[in-house]
Amino acid sequence: MGGIPPGLWVALLDDARSRARVHEKVYRRGPGQCHYWLGALTSSGHGRVRLRVRAASAPHPASVVVAADVYLYQESRGLLRPLPDGAYPLVRHRCGEPSCLNPIHLAGGTAGGSAAGAIAAGSMTGQAADIRGAQGRAMAIRDAIVGAIAAGATPGEIAVAIEAAAVAGIPAVQMALPFPGGTDLLPGHCRADTGVAAAAASLVVILAGQGELF
């Protein structure tokens, strides 16, 4: 819950301006793909945003920094409820990408369950293997999307930019290139179609040959 009391969470989730501020910073793709955060990022690669709202019982508006994944998880599933020990569940990312905000990739769990779930989702070939660290990886993906949009890129071109940014921090010796066998070894659930992944992999090969991956 990030130290935010339930009453304030209710106000934040009900406030149209708060919802709009969160949603405007999410780049959405297909139903099963990662939806990436385009705003500020924590050192762990999670999205964050400052919101201002007044709770029903509060005399003055509150200004709080909110975890984007916690906000969107609760928006889609309802308020997090405390565990038997009084602690609140964590929001984990089944895809292994902390900046992903696709609600179907988010799940409630404990710290141990979060780590196990990330490994089970295949993040050891993605975020966990990235030499840039979680924040560096998330920033690279965010900046690739923002730059592609600013350049007027098509959704397909943006998908190529995302894949290239995602694999650029993974040492080539640890990465199996995804053609001709498809995209099964690309990070998490953030795989594009085979053609897009092959284009991204081709870009990685070119960069590796030029010594620009490290």
Regions found by a protein language model. Name each.
Residues 1-66, 86, 95-98, 159-163, ...:
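Short helix-coil boundary/hinge micro-motifs
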Residues 62-189:
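Short, cationic Gly/His-enriched loop motifs
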